[in-house]
Swiss-Prot record:
Record-linked InterPro entries: Prot-tyrosine_phosphatase-like (IPR029021), Tyr_Pase_AS (IPR016130), Tyr_Pase_dom (IPR000387)
Mutation effect (residue 378 to S): Loss of phosphatase activity and decreased inhibition of EFR phosphorylation
PROSITE patterns: TYR_PHOSPHATASE_1 (PS00383), TYR_PHOSPHATASE_2 (PS50056)
Name of the featured protein: Effector protein hopD2
Primary localisation category: secreted
Domain Tyrosine-protein phosphatase: 143-468
Activity modulation: Inhibited by sodium orthovanadate.
Gene3D superfamilies: 3.30.70.1690, Protein tyrosine phosphatase superfamily
GO terms, molecular function: protein tyrosine phosphatase activity
Length: 468
């Protein structure tokens, strides 16, 4: 990917030169859905999981084998996108025999090709339509049943409540439509850049003066936790460390979108919803950003657009031309400041995926157990940042305080970022933010039942309660 091509294209595009605002319409986004290059378990619908479970229990050993191969390939991230047509998509991988092929009836599973056909449903999850195993000596095809209705789920004993245990919530993590190259431009996130180590929406559990009198604060001051907007300078990192009392500091970057620092300015390759990298794995997203930075370092000049124009908040693009580029990654800036840099990508306006949640828990628990300072940040310092700060509070204090108490106090500390008020949220964002709130309530249950000494991670615990 050449990051400069969409920059120039978008700046000279007739829509932009005409001064029109870029808008993200839900219907347009669905019609131009960009399916992920690889599909994960978290992207499968409940119906897909039930279909695989059903096939695994059938007397037909071929069906059992294919269901097992499909589940393992999805879990290992081996399926690769082959073709798509609107909501229909095909993924393919090659399969090899297991260590004990006889136990699987897979003596001829060398150089076999496994494909699945899936359909994107209204919840932006994938239902499995069919699966096919092709090899030199056999070909097996199975059709998955259509998604069961609510009545079917209830009659099968797999209703939402019973499937995850009493009072447990069925979560529906969904990946939003990835923005196309034509939608994405290189923007300046903040102009003028912050000075003297300052940053917007900075808050720390070392300073609770923003909280109203009488609010429950038990355990907050023990977290050594901070949150803020994007980081773009060594001075900012040093300022954060000082505010947290000095000592070791981990900077946890929650941004999925490709970003860098150019001539001291924070820049991002993004579209209207900031979904340029939606659906990419952590590895693929990092590789895309690395390629962008490499290309920028070869560039002599760069024309950038004000981020608020791309978001649809301004009618004037307010372009800025930079020359003699000094390009740095956030990792380089954080490392120069003497801090540890960690990255767990979360899609903007969304909650962490199950896989990302496991990574976050590992990092957060390490900092809590080692009594090390942790600062989390996204782009604006609001949604993803507040979500992560609530998760840290829950890991430490879920046994002593309710989910409502912990969500409310961290939202209040985060400049009154009310995560429970969805009344003014756009229709495109609403399902993701509703699911984020359900996730936090479920995460409180996890943190209460899995204090730091226990070995179950988030996905293991969710699998465990699904069987209860």
């Amino acid at each position: 990917m050449n990051p400069l091509q969409p920059i120039q294209h978008s700046i000279t595009n007739s829509q932009m030169s005409g001064g029109q605002q870029l808008e993200a319409e839900g219907s347009q986004a669905h019609n131009s859905y960009s399916h992920p290059d690889r599909i994960s378990l978290s992207q499968l619908s409940q119906s897909a999981h039930l279909a695989l479970d059903h096939l695994s229990t059938q007397p037909n050993t071929d069906h059992q084998r294919v269901a097992s191969l499909v589940r393992n390939a999805v879990q290992d991230g081996k399926f690769q996108l082959q073709s798509s047509n609107d909501t229909q998509v095909t993924y393919k991988t090659s399969v090899c025999p297991p260590a004990n092929a006889d136990t699987m009836g897979a003596a001829h599973l060398i150089n076999n090709e496994l494909t699945v056909q899936a359909r994107l449903n209204d919840q932006l999850e994938y239902d499995i339509v069919s699966a096919h195993l092709y090899g030199p000596s056999e070909a097996i095809s199975i059709d998955a049943s259509s998604p069961p209705s609510a009545n079917d789920l209830a009659s099968s004993g797999l209703s939402e409540r019973t499937h995850l245990g009493m009072n447990r919530v069925l979560l529906r993590y969904a990946v939003p439509p990835r923005e196309t190259e034509d939608q994405c431009v290189m923007v300046i996130d903040k102009m003028p850049p912050p000075k003297h180590g300052k940053m917007s929406f900075f808050r720390t559990t070392n300073d609770l003066s923003k909280l109203p009198l009488g609010m429950e604060t038990g355990g907050l001051s023990d977290l050594k936790l901070a949150g803020c907007e994007r980081i773009s300078s060594v001075e900012q990192v040093k300022s954060i460390r000082a505010a947290l009392g000095g000592g070791p500091l981990t900077v946890l970057d929650l941004r999925e979108e490709s970003h860098a620092i150019v001539n001291g300015l924070p820049i991002t390759l993004r579209g209207p919803m900031d979904w340029a990298n939606a659906g990419l794995s952590q590895v693929d997203g990092a590789a895309r950003e690395s390629a962008m930075i490499t290309e920028l370092k070869r560039t002599k000049s760069l024309t950038l657009v004000d981020a608020n124009y791309v978001k649809g908040k301004k009618s004037n693009p307010q372009t800025t031309e930079l020359k003699n580029l000094n390009v740095r990654s956030e990792r380089e800036v954080v490392t120069e400041a003497g801090a540890t840099y960690r990255r767990v990508a979360i899609t903007d306006h969304n909650r962490p995926s199950p896989e990302a949640t496991d990574e976050l828990v590992d990092i957060m628990r390490h900092c809590l157990q080692a009594n090390e300072s942790l600062v989390v940040h996204c782009n604006g310092g609001r949604g993803r940042t507040t979500t992560a700060m609530i998760m840290v509070d829950m890991l430490k204090n879920a046994r002593n305080h309710s989910a409502e108490t912990l969500i409310t106090r961290m939202a209040k500390l985060s400049y009154d970022y009310n995560m429970t008020d969805l009344g003014s949220i756009s229709a495109l964002k609403r399902p993701f933010l509703e699911d984020r709130l359900k996730f936090l309530q479920a995460f409180h249950d996890y943190a209460r039942n899995n204090p730091s000494g226990l070995s179950l991670n988030w996905t293991q615990w969710r699998a465990k309660i699904a069987l209860e």
